[in-house]
Swiss-Prot record:
It comes from Rhodococcus opacus. Inhibited by methimazole. The gene is npcA. Optimum pH is 8. Its EC number is 1.14.13.166, 1.14.13.29. Disruption phenotype: Cells lacking this gene completely lose the ability to grow on 4-NP, 4-NCA, and hydroxyquinol. The 4-NP/4-NCA monooxygenase is composed of an oxygenase component NpcA and a reductase component NpcB. Pfam families: HpaB (PF03241), HpaB_N (PF11794). One of its GO terms (biological process) is catabolic process. This is 4-nitrophenol 4-monooxygenase/4-nitrocatechol 2-monooxygenase, oxygenase component. The keyword Membrane does not apply. Involved in the degradation of para-nitrophenol (4-NP). Catalyzes both the initial hydroxylation of 4-NP to produce 4-nitrocatechol (4-NCA) and the subsequent oxidative release of the nitro group from 4-NCA to produce 2-hydroxy-1,4-benzoquinone. It can also use 4-nitroresorcinol as substrate with a rate of nitrite release similar to that observed with the two physiological substrates, 4-PN and 4-NCA. InterPro entries: Acyl-CoA_Oxase/DH_mid-dom_sf, AcylCo_DH-like_C, AcylCoA_DH/oxidase_NM_dom_sf, HpaB/PvcC/4-BUDH, HpaB/PvcC/4-BUDH_C, HpaB/PvcC/4-BUDH_N.
Length: 528
Protein backbone atom coordinates (compact mmCIF):
# COMPACT_ATOMS: atom_id res chain seq x y z
CA UNK A 1 0.00 0.00 0.00
CA UNK A 2 1.28 3.45 -0.78
CA UNK A 3 1.09 6.64 1.24
CA UNK A 4 -0.81 9.75 0.30
CA UNK A 5 2.46 11.51 -0.48
CA UNK A 6 3.53 8.71 -2.80
CA UNK A 7 0.18 8.99 -4.53
CA UNK A 8 0.61 12.74 -5.05
CA UNK A 9 4.13 12.21 -6.40
CA UNK A 10 2.75 9.68 -8.91
CA UNK A 11 0.53 12.40 -10.40
CA UNK A 12 3.54 14.61 -11.21
CA UNK A 13 4.48 12.66 -14.31
CA UNK A 14 4.15 15.09 -17.21
CA UNK A 15 0.54 14.24 -18.00
CA UNK A 16 -1.42 16.47 -20.38
CA UNK A 17 -4.52 17.62 -18.49
CA UNK A 18 -6.80 20.42 -19.69
CA UNK A 19 -9.49 21.86 -17.40
CA UNK A 20 -11.74 24.50 -18.89
CA UNK A 21 -9.26 25.02 -21.72
CA UNK A 22 -6.30 25.53 -19.39
CA UNK A 23 -3.32 23.17 -19.39
CA UNK A 24 -2.72 22.18 -15.78
CA UNK A 25 1.00 21.99 -14.98
CA UNK A 26 0.57 20.14 -11.69
CA UNK A 27 -2.80 18.70 -10.66
CA UNK A 28 -1.62 18.42 -7.05
CA UNK A 29 -1.15 22.19 -6.64
CA UNK A 30 -3.45 23.93 -9.13
CA UNK A 31 -6.54 25.46 -7.44
CA UNK A 32 -8.92 23.71 -9.85
CA UNK A 33 -7.59 20.25 -9.05
CA UNK A 34 -5.59 20.26 -5.81
CA UNK A 35 -8.59 19.80 -3.50
CA UNK A 36 -9.57 16.43 -4.92
CA UNK A 37 -5.96 15.29 -5.20
CA UNK A 38 -5.50 15.97 -1.48
CA UNK A 39 -8.76 14.16 -0.68
CA UNK A 40 -7.54 11.02 -2.45
CA UNK A 41 -4.13 11.34 -0.78
CA UNK A 42 -6.03 11.20 2.50
CA UNK A 43 -7.84 8.14 1.13
CA UNK A 44 -4.52 6.32 0.77
CA UNK A 45 -3.22 7.47 4.15
CA UNK A 46 -6.31 6.22 5.95
CA UNK A 47 -5.62 2.72 4.64
CA UNK A 48 -2.38 2.86 6.63
CA UNK A 49 -4.05 4.06 9.83
CA UNK A 50 -4.08 1.18 12.38
CA UNK A 51 -7.43 2.44 13.68
CA UNK A 52 -9.11 1.50 10.38
CA UNK A 53 -6.98 -1.51 9.47
CA UNK A 54 -9.70 -4.13 9.96
CA UNK A 55 -12.18 -2.32 7.69
CA UNK A 56 -9.88 -0.88 5.03
CA UNK A 57 -7.29 -3.61 4.48
CA UNK A 58 -6.88 -7.37 4.11
CA UNK A 59 -4.01 -9.85 4.05
CA UNK A 60 -3.61 -11.70 0.74
CA UNK A 61 -2.61 -15.35 0.23
CA UNK A 62 1.07 -14.39 0.34
CA UNK A 63 0.71 -12.68 3.71
CA UNK A 64 0.89 -9.17 2.26
CA UNK A 65 -1.47 -6.53 3.64
CA UNK A 66 -3.29 -4.69 0.85
CA UNK A 67 -6.07 -2.20 0.39
CA UNK A 68 -9.59 -3.60 0.34
CA UNK A 69 -10.07 -2.02 -3.08
CA UNK A 70 -8.18 -5.09 -4.39
CA UNK A 71 -10.11 -7.62 -2.27
CA UNK A 72 -11.76 -10.40 -4.31
CA UNK A 73 -14.82 -11.73 -2.43
CA UNK A 74 -15.16 -15.51 -2.28
CA UNK A 75 -18.04 -15.87 0.19
CA UNK A 76 -21.16 -14.10 1.41
CA UNK A 77 -19.18 -12.87 4.41
CA UNK A 78 -16.59 -11.40 2.02
CA UNK A 79 -19.34 -9.54 0.15
CA UNK A 80 -20.62 -8.07 3.42
CA UNK A 81 -17.06 -7.06 4.28
CA UNK A 82 -16.74 -5.25 0.97
CA UNK A 83 -20.05 -3.48 1.62
CA UNK A 84 -18.72 -2.23 4.96
CA UNK A 85 -15.60 -0.99 3.15
CA UNK A 86 -17.56 0.98 0.57
CA UNK A 87 -19.92 2.35 3.21
CA UNK A 88 -16.90 3.66 5.12
CA UNK A 89 -15.76 5.71 2.15
CA UNK A 90 -19.16 7.08 1.21
CA UNK A 91 -19.66 8.22 4.78
CA UNK A 92 -16.15 9.65 4.92
CA UNK A 93 -16.69 11.55 1.67
CA UNK A 94 -19.73 13.45 2.94
CA UNK A 95 -22.38 10.92 1.98
CA UNK A 96 -20.92 10.02 -1.40
CA UNK A 97 -20.03 13.40 -2.90
CA UNK A 98 -17.05 11.70 -4.55
CA UNK A 99 -18.63 8.95 -6.59
CA UNK A 100 -15.48 7.41 -8.04
CA UNK A 101 -12.70 7.02 -5.49
CA UNK A 102 -10.27 4.22 -6.37
CA UNK A 103 -12.49 1.76 -4.46
CA UNK A 104 -15.21 2.33 -7.03
CA UNK A 105 -13.06 1.98 -10.14
CA UNK A 106 -10.69 -0.92 -9.55
CA UNK A 107 -13.61 -3.35 -9.52
CA UNK A 108 -13.83 -3.05 -13.31
CA UNK A 109 -11.03 -5.62 -13.48
CA UNK A 110 -12.79 -8.15 -11.23
CA UNK A 111 -14.69 -9.86 -14.06
CA UNK A 112 -11.51 -10.00 -16.14
CA UNK A 113 -9.31 -11.64 -13.52
CA UNK A 114 -12.20 -13.94 -12.57
CA UNK A 115 -12.53 -15.28 -16.15
CA UNK A 116 -9.69 -14.04 -18.39
CA UNK A 117 -9.75 -16.78 -21.04
CA UNK A 118 -12.60 -15.38 -23.23
CA UNK A 119 -10.70 -12.12 -23.61
CA UNK A 120 -8.09 -14.02 -25.58
CA UNK A 121 -10.27 -16.72 -27.11
CA UNK A 122 -12.61 -14.15 -28.66
CA UNK A 123 -9.89 -11.82 -29.95
CA UNK A 124 -9.08 -11.22 -33.61
CA UNK A 125 -5.45 -10.22 -34.22
CA UNK A 126 -4.01 -9.27 -37.60
CA UNK A 127 -0.93 -10.78 -39.18
CA UNK A 128 -1.32 -14.24 -37.71
CA UNK A 129 0.10 -13.09 -34.38
CA UNK A 130 -0.65 -15.13 -31.30
CA UNK A 131 -1.12 -12.95 -28.23
CA UNK A 132 -2.02 -14.45 -24.86
CA UNK A 133 -4.45 -11.80 -23.68
CA UNK A 134 -5.52 -13.95 -20.72
CA UNK A 135 -1.92 -14.00 -19.48
CA UNK A 136 -1.76 -10.25 -20.09
CA UNK A 137 -4.74 -9.72 -17.80
CA UNK A 138 -3.20 -11.89 -15.07
CA UNK A 139 0.09 -9.98 -15.29
CA UNK A 140 -1.68 -6.63 -15.30
CA UNK A 141 -3.66 -7.59 -12.20
CA UNK A 142 -0.48 -8.65 -10.42
CA UNK A 143 1.21 -5.37 -11.30
CA UNK A 144 -1.60 -2.95 -10.42
CA UNK A 145 -2.35 -4.67 -7.12
CA UNK A 146 1.32 -4.83 -6.13
CA UNK A 147 2.00 -1.19 -7.06
CA UNK A 148 -1.43 0.01 -5.81
CA UNK A 149 -2.10 1.74 -9.12
CA UNK A 150 -5.10 4.08 -9.43
CA UNK A 151 -7.27 3.17 -12.44
CA UNK A 152 -10.17 4.84 -14.22
CA UNK A 153 -12.36 2.99 -16.75
CA UNK A 154 -13.24 4.66 -20.06
CA UNK A 155 -15.80 2.67 -22.03
CA UNK A 156 -18.18 5.30 -23.43
CA UNK A 157 -17.66 6.57 -26.97
CA UNK A 158 -18.46 9.93 -28.53
CA UNK A 159 -22.03 10.93 -29.33
CA UNK A 160 -21.89 11.26 -33.11
CA UNK A 161 -24.91 10.38 -35.25
CA UNK A 162 -26.94 7.82 -33.36
CA UNK A 163 -29.73 7.87 -35.89
CA UNK A 164 -27.87 5.55 -38.27
CA UNK A 165 -26.27 2.22 -37.45
CA UNK A 166 -23.71 2.74 -40.20
CA UNK A 167 -22.65 6.11 -38.77
CA UNK A 168 -20.35 4.49 -36.23
CA UNK A 169 -17.64 3.92 -38.84
CA UNK A 170 -17.54 7.69 -39.39
CA UNK A 171 -17.08 8.61 -35.75
CA UNK A 172 -13.75 9.82 -34.36
CA UNK A 173 -13.96 7.19 -31.62
CA UNK A 174 -10.84 5.35 -30.50
CA UNK A 175 -9.69 2.95 -33.24
CA UNK A 176 -6.68 0.87 -34.11
CA UNK A 177 -4.68 2.41 -36.95
CA UNK A 178 -1.76 -0.02 -36.86
CA UNK A 179 -0.81 -3.44 -35.50
CA UNK A 180 2.82 -4.54 -35.39
CA UNK A 181 5.01 -7.01 -33.51
CA UNK A 182 5.42 -4.63 -30.57
CA UNK A 183 1.80 -3.60 -30.06
CA UNK A 184 -0.95 -1.42 -31.47
CA UNK A 185 -1.29 2.25 -32.38
CA UNK A 186 -4.62 3.90 -31.62
CA UNK A 187 -6.19 7.19 -32.59
CA UNK A 188 -9.40 8.95 -31.54
CA UNK A 189 -11.57 9.79 -28.56
CA UNK A 190 -12.92 8.08 -25.51
CA UNK A 191 -15.85 10.18 -24.42
CA UNK A 192 -16.27 9.80 -20.68
CA UNK A 193 -14.26 9.01 -17.58
CA UNK A 194 -14.34 10.20 -13.98
CA UNK A 195 -11.36 11.36 -11.90
CA UNK A 196 -9.18 11.24 -15.01
CA UNK A 197 -6.58 13.79 -13.80
CA UNK A 198 -6.18 11.89 -10.53
CA UNK A 199 -5.41 8.33 -11.66
CA UNK A 200 -2.29 6.63 -12.94
CA UNK A 201 -3.73 4.54 -15.76
CA UNK A 202 -6.84 4.38 -17.93
CA UNK A 203 -8.64 1.12 -18.56
CA UNK A 204 -10.18 1.66 -21.99
CA UNK A 205 -12.86 -0.54 -23.48
CA UNK A 206 -16.15 -0.57 -25.39
CA UNK A 207 -19.83 -0.85 -24.72
CA UNK A 208 -21.12 -2.36 -27.96
CA UNK A 209 -23.15 -0.31 -30.40
CA UNK A 210 -24.64 -1.35 -33.76
CA UNK A 211 -22.14 -0.94 -36.57
CA UNK A 212 -19.06 -1.22 -34.36
CA UNK A 213 -16.03 -2.38 -36.35
CA UNK A 214 -13.15 -4.66 -35.51
CA UNK A 215 -10.67 -1.77 -35.36
CA UNK A 216 -12.95 0.09 -32.94
CA UNK A 217 -12.96 -2.82 -30.48
CA UNK A 218 -10.09 -2.12 -28.09
CA UNK A 219 -9.53 -3.05 -24.44
CA UNK A 220 -6.25 -2.00 -22.85
CA UNK A 221 -4.53 -0.32 -19.92
CA UNK A 222 -2.88 2.99 -20.83
CA UNK A 223 -0.72 5.09 -18.46
CA UNK A 224 -2.05 8.64 -18.25
CA UNK A 225 1.34 10.15 -19.13
CA UNK A 226 1.69 8.13 -22.36
CA UNK A 227 2.95 10.36 -25.22
CA UNK A 228 0.08 11.52 -27.42
CA UNK A 229 -2.60 11.16 -24.74
CA UNK A 230 -4.52 14.30 -23.73
CA UNK A 231 -7.20 14.53 -21.04
CA UNK A 232 -9.87 17.18 -21.65
CA UNK A 233 -11.93 17.75 -18.51
CA UNK A 234 -15.07 19.73 -17.93
CA UNK A 235 -14.93 23.05 -16.12
CA UNK A 236 -14.18 22.59 -12.45
CA UNK A 237 -16.91 23.35 -9.92
CA UNK A 238 -14.45 23.51 -7.04
CA UNK A 239 -14.40 26.72 -4.96
CA UNK A 240 -11.06 26.55 -3.15
CA UNK A 241 -11.13 30.20 -2.08
CA UNK A 242 -14.63 30.12 -0.56
CA UNK A 243 -15.42 29.61 3.11
CA UNK A 244 -16.38 26.00 3.93
CA UNK A 245 -19.38 27.28 5.88
CA UNK A 246 -20.80 28.87 2.74
CA UNK A 247 -19.74 26.07 0.38
CA UNK A 248 -19.34 22.91 2.46
CA UNK A 249 -18.84 20.58 -0.51
CA UNK A 250 -17.22 22.42 -3.42
CA UNK A 251 -14.45 23.69 -1.13
CA UNK A 252 -13.38 20.06 -0.66
CA UNK A 253 -12.80 19.62 -4.39
CA UNK A 254 -14.26 18.30 -7.64
CA UNK A 255 -13.52 14.79 -8.91
CA UNK A 256 -13.81 16.02 -12.53
CA UNK A 257 -15.10 14.09 -15.52
CA UNK A 258 -13.42 14.27 -18.88
CA UNK A 259 -12.69 12.98 -22.35
CA UNK A 260 -9.43 11.50 -23.60
CA UNK A 261 -7.85 12.04 -27.02
CA UNK A 262 -5.33 9.52 -28.31
CA UNK A 263 -3.08 11.03 -30.98
CA UNK A 264 -1.47 7.94 -32.51
CA UNK A 265 -0.78 6.47 -29.08
CA UNK A 266 1.33 3.32 -28.95
CA UNK A 267 0.12 0.55 -26.60
CA UNK A 268 2.48 -2.42 -26.15
CA UNK A 269 0.93 -5.87 -26.40
CA UNK A 270 1.45 -6.58 -22.70
CA UNK A 271 -0.99 -3.74 -21.90
CA UNK A 272 -3.67 -4.95 -24.33
CA UNK A 273 -6.56 -7.08 -23.03
CA UNK A 274 -8.59 -7.72 -26.18
CA UNK A 275 -8.97 -6.43 -29.73
CA UNK A 276 -10.88 -7.16 -32.87
CA UNK A 277 -14.20 -8.78 -31.94
CA UNK A 278 -17.27 -6.50 -31.65
CA UNK A 279 -19.38 -9.44 -30.43
CA UNK A 280 -17.13 -9.68 -27.37
CA UNK A 281 -18.21 -6.13 -26.51
CA UNK A 282 -21.86 -7.19 -26.31
CA UNK A 283 -21.58 -9.28 -23.15
CA UNK A 284 -18.30 -9.20 -21.26
CA UNK A 285 -18.16 -5.46 -20.45
CA UNK A 286 -21.58 -5.73 -18.80
CA UNK A 287 -20.12 -8.36 -16.49
CA UNK A 288 -17.33 -5.93 -15.66
CA UNK A 289 -19.76 -3.20 -14.72
CA UNK A 290 -21.90 -5.52 -12.62
CA UNK A 291 -19.18 -5.10 -10.01
CA UNK A 292 -19.26 -1.32 -10.36
CA UNK A 293 -23.03 -1.33 -9.92
CA UNK A 294 -22.70 -3.23 -6.65
CA UNK A 295 -20.65 -0.33 -5.34
CA UNK A 296 -23.17 2.10 -6.85
CA UNK A 297 -26.04 0.43 -5.00
CA UNK A 298 -24.16 0.77 -1.71
CA UNK A 299 -23.58 4.48 -2.40
CA UNK A 300 -27.27 4.94 -3.13
CA UNK A 301 -28.22 3.45 0.24
CA UNK A 302 -25.78 5.76 2.05
CA UNK A 303 -27.08 8.78 0.13
CA UNK A 304 -30.66 7.87 1.00
CA UNK A 305 -29.64 7.66 4.66
CA UNK A 306 -28.13 11.14 4.44
CA UNK A 307 -31.38 12.53 3.02
CA UNK A 308 -33.35 11.03 5.90
CA UNK A 309 -30.89 12.43 8.44
CA UNK A 310 -30.98 15.92 6.94
CA UNK A 311 -34.78 15.82 6.85
CA UNK A 312 -35.03 14.80 10.52
CA UNK A 313 -32.55 17.46 11.67
CA UNK A 314 -34.19 20.11 9.50
CA UNK A 315 -37.78 19.50 10.57
CA UNK A 316 -36.68 19.39 14.19
CA UNK A 317 -34.87 22.72 13.78
CA UNK A 318 -37.97 24.23 12.17
CA UNK A 319 -40.35 22.75 14.73
CA UNK A 320 -42.40 20.97 12.08
CA UNK A 321 -41.40 17.41 12.94
CA UNK A 322 -44.53 16.71 15.02
CA UNK A 323 -46.93 17.77 12.28
CA UNK A 324 -48.84 14.64 11.13
CA UNK A 325 -48.40 15.51 7.45
CA UNK A 326 -44.67 16.04 7.92
CA UNK A 327 -44.39 12.79 9.85
CA UNK A 328 -46.05 10.96 6.96
CA UNK A 329 -43.61 12.55 4.52
CA UNK A 330 -40.68 11.63 6.75
CA UNK A 331 -41.95 8.05 6.78
CA UNK A 332 -41.77 8.04 2.97
CA UNK A 333 -38.11 9.05 3.13
CA UNK A 334 -37.35 6.41 5.74
CA UNK A 335 -39.01 3.77 3.55
CA UNK A 336 -36.92 4.94 0.59
CA UNK A 337 -33.72 4.51 2.58
CA UNK A 338 -34.68 1.14 4.04
CA UNK A 339 -35.70 -0.20 0.63
CA UNK A 340 -32.38 0.84 -0.92
CA UNK A 341 -30.54 -0.94 1.88
CA UNK A 342 -32.80 -4.00 1.60
CA UNK A 343 -31.93 -4.45 -2.07
CA UNK A 344 -28.21 -4.39 -1.21
CA UNK A 345 -28.68 -7.03 1.48
CA UNK A 346 -30.92 -9.14 -0.78
CA UNK A 347 -28.23 -9.07 -3.48
CA UNK A 348 -25.71 -10.48 -1.02
CA UNK A 349 -28.08 -13.07 0.44
CA UNK A 350 -28.98 -14.45 -2.99
CA UNK A 351 -25.51 -14.13 -4.51
CA UNK A 352 -23.71 -16.93 -6.33
CA UNK A 353 -20.22 -18.24 -6.95
CA UNK A 354 -18.80 -17.55 -10.41
CA UNK A 355 -16.89 -20.04 -12.52
CA UNK A 356 -13.69 -18.39 -11.33
CA UNK A 357 -14.61 -18.73 -7.67
CA UNK A 358 -15.73 -15.19 -6.82
CA UNK A 359 -18.86 -14.64 -4.76
CA UNK A 360 -20.97 -12.20 -6.75
CA UNK A 361 -24.01 -10.48 -5.24
CA UNK A 362 -27.13 -11.18 -7.30
CA UNK A 363 -27.02 -8.66 -10.14
CA UNK A 364 -30.80 -8.81 -10.53
CA UNK A 365 -31.32 -7.32 -7.07
CA UNK A 366 -28.53 -4.87 -7.78
CA UNK A 367 -30.30 -3.69 -10.94
CA UNK A 368 -33.71 -3.60 -9.25
CA UNK A 369 -32.21 -1.60 -6.41
CA UNK A 370 -30.58 0.88 -8.79
CA UNK A 371 -33.88 1.28 -10.62
CA UNK A 372 -35.72 1.89 -7.33
CA UNK A 373 -33.23 4.61 -6.42
CA UNK A 374 -33.43 6.36 -9.79
CA UNK A 375 -37.23 6.20 -9.78
CA UNK A 376 -37.52 7.77 -6.32
CA UNK A 377 -34.51 10.00 -5.72
CA UNK A 378 -36.08 13.08 -7.33
CA UNK A 379 -39.15 12.86 -5.12
CA UNK A 380 -36.95 12.39 -2.06
CA UNK A 381 -34.82 15.43 -2.86
CA UNK A 382 -37.86 17.55 -3.72
CA UNK A 383 -39.44 16.58 -0.41
CA UNK A 384 -36.29 17.63 1.43
CA UNK A 385 -36.29 20.99 -0.36
CA UNK A 386 -39.97 21.50 0.41
CA UNK A 387 -39.21 20.98 4.09
CA UNK A 388 -36.71 23.87 3.80
CA UNK A 389 -39.09 26.44 2.39
CA UNK A 390 -37.45 29.78 1.68
CA UNK A 391 -34.65 29.05 4.12
CA UNK A 392 -32.74 27.05 1.51
CA UNK A 393 -32.45 30.23 -0.58
CA UNK A 394 -32.35 32.93 2.10
CA UNK A 395 -29.31 31.66 3.97
CA UNK A 396 -26.86 34.20 5.41
CA UNK A 397 -23.16 33.71 4.76
CA UNK A 398 -20.43 33.35 7.35
CA UNK A 399 -19.50 36.96 6.67
CA UNK A 400 -23.06 37.99 7.55
CA UNK A 401 -22.88 36.16 10.85
CA UNK A 402 -19.43 37.59 11.59
CA UNK A 403 -20.57 41.17 10.92
CA UNK A 404 -20.56 43.17 14.18
CA UNK A 405 -23.96 44.75 13.52
CA UNK A 406 -25.79 42.09 11.46
CA UNK A 407 -24.45 39.02 13.20
CA UNK A 408 -26.21 39.34 16.56
CA UNK A 409 -29.49 40.25 14.89
CA UNK A 410 -29.28 37.25 12.54
CA UNK A 411 -28.46 34.98 15.47
CA UNK A 412 -31.65 36.15 17.14
CA UNK A 413 -33.87 36.01 14.05
CA UNK A 414 -32.79 32.61 12.72
CA UNK A 415 -32.36 30.53 15.84
CA UNK A 416 -34.36 27.31 15.85
CA UNK A 417 -35.77 24.79 18.26
CA UNK A 418 -32.80 23.94 20.50
CA UNK A 419 -30.38 24.91 17.73
CA UNK A 420 -28.34 28.04 17.06
CA UNK A 421 -28.88 30.18 14.00
CA UNK A 422 -25.48 29.25 12.56
CA UNK A 423 -26.10 25.53 12.94
CA UNK A 424 -29.61 25.81 11.55
CA UNK A 425 -28.41 27.74 8.50
CA UNK A 426 -25.63 25.19 7.97
CA UNK A 427 -28.35 22.60 7.30
CA UNK A 428 -29.85 24.86 4.64
CA UNK A 429 -26.44 25.47 3.07
CA UNK A 430 -25.65 21.77 2.92
CA UNK A 431 -28.93 21.07 1.15
CA UNK A 432 -28.53 24.06 -1.16
CA UNK A 433 -25.06 23.17 -2.40
CA UNK A 434 -25.80 19.47 -2.65
CA UNK A 435 -28.98 19.84 -4.70
CA UNK A 436 -29.41 23.41 -6.00
CA UNK A 437 -26.04 24.39 -7.47
CA UNK A 438 -23.99 23.52 -10.54
CA UNK A 439 -21.83 21.37 -8.27
CA UNK A 440 -24.93 19.46 -7.19
CA UNK A 441 -26.37 19.26 -10.71
CA UNK A 442 -23.26 17.46 -11.93
CA UNK A 443 -23.65 14.96 -9.10
CA UNK A 444 -27.29 14.39 -10.08
CA UNK A 445 -26.37 13.83 -13.73
CA UNK A 446 -23.63 11.41 -12.75
CA UNK A 447 -26.05 9.24 -10.80
CA UNK A 448 -28.57 9.40 -13.63
CA UNK A 449 -26.24 8.19 -16.38
CA UNK A 450 -23.01 6.71 -14.98
CA UNK A 451 -24.34 3.20 -14.48
CA UNK A 452 -26.62 3.17 -17.54
CA UNK A 453 -29.83 5.24 -17.65
CA UNK A 454 -33.02 4.04 -16.00
CA UNK A 455 -34.64 2.61 -19.14
CA UNK A 456 -31.57 0.48 -19.82
CA UNK A 457 -31.44 -0.74 -16.22
CA UNK A 458 -35.02 -1.95 -16.69
CA UNK A 459 -34.20 -3.52 -20.05
CA UNK A 460 -31.22 -5.38 -18.61
CA UNK A 461 -33.44 -6.72 -15.85
CA UNK A 462 -35.80 -8.26 -18.41
CA UNK A 463 -32.94 -9.66 -20.48
CA UNK A 464 -31.09 -11.26 -17.60
CA UNK A 465 -33.84 -12.83 -15.50
CA UNK A 466 -36.55 -15.47 -15.64
CA UNK A 467 -39.18 -12.73 -15.87
CA UNK A 468 -40.43 -14.23 -19.14
CA UNK A 469 -43.71 -15.77 -20.25
CA UNK A 470 -42.24 -19.28 -19.97
CA UNK A 471 -40.38 -18.56 -16.73
CA UNK A 472 -41.20 -19.54 -13.15
CA UNK A 473 -43.13 -16.33 -12.47
CA UNK A 474 -45.97 -17.55 -14.70
CA UNK A 475 -46.22 -20.97 -13.03
CA UNK A 476 -48.88 -19.91 -10.53
CA UNK A 477 -50.90 -17.94 -13.10
CA UNK A 478 -50.92 -20.89 -15.52
CA UNK A 479 -51.97 -23.19 -12.69
CA UNK A 480 -54.85 -20.89 -11.72
CA UNK A 481 -55.99 -20.64 -15.34
CA UNK A 482 -55.60 -24.35 -15.96
CA UNK A 483 -53.30 -23.71 -18.90
CA UNK A 484 -50.59 -26.22 -18.11
CA UNK A 485 -47.09 -25.43 -19.34
CA UNK A 486 -46.27 -23.26 -22.33
CA UNK A 487 -45.76 -26.29 -24.57
CA UNK A 488 -49.35 -27.38 -23.91
CA UNK A 489 -50.56 -23.86 -24.68
CA UNK A 490 -48.65 -23.82 -27.95
CA UNK A 491 -49.94 -27.27 -28.93
CA UNK A 492 -53.56 -26.24 -28.39
CA UNK A 493 -53.03 -23.04 -30.35
CA UNK A 494 -51.48 -24.98 -33.24
CA UNK A 495 -54.39 -27.43 -33.32
CA UNK A 496 -56.94 -24.62 -33.46
CA UNK A 497 -55.00 -22.86 -36.18
CA UNK A 498 -54.68 -26.02 -38.27
CA UNK A 499 -58.45 -26.54 -38.35
CA UNK A 500 -59.47 -22.91 -38.70
CA UNK A 501 -60.68 -21.21 -41.85
CA UNK A 502 -58.84 -17.99 -41.09
CA UNK A 503 -55.51 -19.78 -40.80
CA UNK A 504 -55.73 -22.07 -43.82
CA UNK A 505 -56.66 -19.28 -46.24
CA UNK A 506 -54.61 -16.49 -44.73
CA UNK A 507 -53.36 -14.11 -47.38
CA UNK A 508 -55.11 -16.02 -50.20
CA UNK A 509 -56.54 -13.51 -52.73
CA UNK A 510 -59.43 -15.80 -53.65
CA UNK A 511 -60.71 -15.95 -50.10
CA UNK A 512 -60.34 -12.23 -49.61
CA UNK A 513 -62.22 -11.54 -52.85
CA UNK A 514 -65.09 -13.83 -51.79
CA UNK A 515 -65.48 -11.91 -48.55
CA UNK A 516 -65.53 -8.58 -50.39
CA UNK A 517 -68.22 -9.81 -52.79
CA UNK A 518 -70.26 -11.31 -49.95
CA UNK A 519 -70.19 -8.08 -47.96
CA UNK A 520 -70.96 -5.88 -50.95
CA UNK A 521 -67.60 -4.15 -51.11
CA UNK A 522 -66.86 -5.49 -54.56
CA UNK A 523 -69.04 -6.36 -57.53
CA UNK A 524 -67.89 -9.01 -59.98
CA UNK A 525 -68.09 -7.88 -63.61
CA UNK A 526 -69.80 -10.29 -65.94
CA UNK A 527 -67.59 -11.89 -68.52
CA UNK A 528 -68.57 -11.09 -72.11
Amino acid sequence: MRTGQQYLESLRDGRQVYVGGELIDDVTTHPKTSGYAKAIAEYYDLHLDPEHQDVLTFVDDDGVRKSMHWFLPRSKADAARRRAYHEFWFRHFQGGIFTRPPAGMHVVMYAQIDDPEPWGDNAVVAGGRTISFADNIRSQWQRVTTDDVALSPMFVDVQFDRGRDDALVETPMLSIVEQNDQGIVVRGWKAMGTSLPFVNELLVGNLWRPGQTSDQTVYAIVPVNTPGLSLVCRQSNATPDADPYDHPLSTIGDELDGMAYFDDVFIPWENVQHIGNPDHAKWYPQRQFDWVHIETQIRHAVHAELIVGLALLLTNALGTNNNPIVQSQLADLVRFRETCKAFAIAAEETGFTTAGGLFKPNNIYVDLGRAHYLENIHNAVNQLIEFCGRGVVMSPTKADFDHPFLGPKLEEALRGTSISARDRVSIFRQISERYLTQWGARHEMFEKFNGTPLYLVRLLTMQRTEYQVDGPLTDLARQVLGFGDTEALAARAAEVEKNSNWASVAYQPEYAREQDVRDGYYKETEKV
